[in-house]
Amino acid sequence: MASARQALLDALEAHPPADDDERRDRAAIIALVAAGPHCFDRDFYTPGHVTGSAFVVDRDSGRVLLHHHRRLDRWLQLGGHDDGEHDPLRTALREAREESGLTDLVPLTRRILDVDVHRIPPAGGEPAHEHHDVRYALVTATPDAIVRADESHDLRWFTLEEAARRMAEPGADRALRRLAALTDWHAG
């Protein structure tokens, strides 16, 4: 097995699921990655492909950065498709930099924050498929340097509680709870 896939499998095996939903999603991602290198191919739709995303945190305030995704019309963490990295953390870093304009992003930890498998509706010639999302926590010291990318309606900082309300989905709530536990910050 290629070393990138093996490294991801090792990281997934080391990641403790918080609940039955995450346990199921982790198993699905492990099965996809173990099945072959197509797991990183954004054109692999059955069932889907690995993506990398990031919950970006302001080092000083503990606020989290979300963008209002133009196509999906929802508040989401930053992230997206593998562009040849074959490493969801590197994908998350690249996507977060592209989508926020923040150049100083660094991982809070190299460990996985959360995993989630979610359905993407058909659009732009792509069929409905699943994103097997591997999520990380990134930190910035320059929160005022954000620049909204074209794929976003809005880009904004929220407390962890506000972010949970805006995202309004169990996987995000779980990731935000983990983020709070990893940091000394208290949303307010």
Question: What are these model-predicted stretches?
Answer:
Residues 16-53:
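Acidic, metal-coordinating catalytic segment for phosphate/diphosphate chemistry
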Residues 83-174:
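Unchanged
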Residues 173-188:
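Charged phosphate-binding loop/patch that engages nucleotide di/tri-phosphates or the phosphate backbone
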Residues 23-26, 136, 188:
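Short glycine-rich, low-complexity/disordered patches
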Residues 1-28, 100:
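Predominantly extracellular/luminal regions of secreted and cell-surface proteins
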Residues 41-77:
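N-terminal strand-loop-strand
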